[in-house]
Amino acid sequence: MARLLDGRSVAAQIRAEVAEGVSELKRRGVPVRLDVILAGEDPASVTYVSNKRRDCAEVGIESRLHAFPADVPQKELLALVERLNGDPEVSGFFIQLPLPGGVDPLPLLSAIDPSKDVDGLSPQSAGRLAVGLPSLLPCTPHGVIQLLRRSGVGLEGREAVVVGRSNLVGKPLALLLLRENATVTVCHSRTRDLAGVTRRAEVLVVAAGRRGMVGAEHVREGAVVVDVGIHRAEDGGLTGDVRQEEVAARAAALTPVPGGVGPMTRAMLLYNTLEAARLREERA
């Protein structure tokens, strides 16, 4: 039976480290503040933002919400992004996605100062990651790496397969795995013989956004399996992209859903906010 990689406990370690770092900066008079841009009233987005702001309060990070109606003009959001870029009191900020239908996210993300891009989702941040320049890393991919590293899972020289090629998770995670000297294959909806490819993986990360798509037939005996997916089941519970019970019988280690990658994503947003504050102190 697979060992469960407990994202909650590892995230708690990171939160404690962030809280200590925030206290240290505050003692030196350095502000640590996260601003959030929210357009519209999508229930999931409102909940996510509320959770993130509560996380900030728990580690001593000040947070401010900039909320707009769904019909907010694009130019008004762009003006706010430019203002936050130039505000020395703001350590970092992010735009809660998805945005309402009338708003194009790309110009807004492109306008974010990379040193304040705590989500790590702007084209500039993606480019810096791709060429190996220092940058704030996307929260979910970085959370996966930290969870593996802090759980004692070595990556150097191992064969890693990522299922999913999104800009949010799959692509940046593949780059981070390469940084760890893993040998990386990326699978997607056009991959032929998906199970044949994934069975080669010593470390298998599933981030396809399809409930229960990976089962025992996709998993090598003794592999480490990371389930990034999260879906609301008919009974109200949460499930992932991996059929957990059958995969647990073959894998050496497995992230649960919930309690695996999700807590790590939230913790890495706090980590990035602290890093952004440190960077601003160095530049001052």
Curated annotation (Swiss-Prot):
InterPro entries: Aminoacid_DH-like_N_sf (IPR046346), NAD(P)-bd_dom_sf (IPR036291), THF_DH/CycHdrlase (IPR000672), THF_DH/CycHdrlase_cat_dom (IPR020630), THF_DH/CycHdrlase_CS (IPR020867), THF_DH/CycHdrlase_NAD-bd_dom (IPR020631). Keywords: Amino-acid biosynthesis, Histidine biosynthesis, Hydrolase, Methionine biosynthesis, Multifunctional enzyme, NADP, One-carbon metabolism, Oxidoreductase, Purine biosynthesis. GO terms for molecular function: methenyltetrahydrofolate cyclohydrolase activity; methylenetetrahydrofolate dehydrogenase (NADP+) activity. GO terms for biological process: L-histidine biosynthetic process; methionine biosynthetic process; purine nucleotide biosynthetic process; tetrahydrofolate interconversion. NADP(+) binds at residues 164-166, 189, 230. The keyword Transport does not apply. PROSITE patterns: THF_DHG_CYH_1. Pathway: One-carbon metabolism; tetrahydrofolate interconversion. It catalyses: (6R)-5,10-methylene-5,6,7,8-tetrahydrofolate + NADP(+) = (6R)-5,10-methenyltetrahydrofolate + NADPH; (6R)-5,10-methenyltetrahydrofolate + H2O = (6R)-10-formyltetrahydrofolate + H(+). Catalyzes the oxidation of 5,10-methylenetetrahydrofolate to 5,10-methenyltetrahydrofolate and then the hydrolysis of 5,10-methenyltetrahydrofolate to 10-formyltetrahydrofolate. Belongs to the tetrahydrofolate dehydrogenase/cyclohydrolase family. Homodimer. This is Bifunctional protein FolD 1. It comes from Rubrobacter xylanophilus (strain DSM 9941 / JCM 11954 / NBRC 16129 / PRD-1).
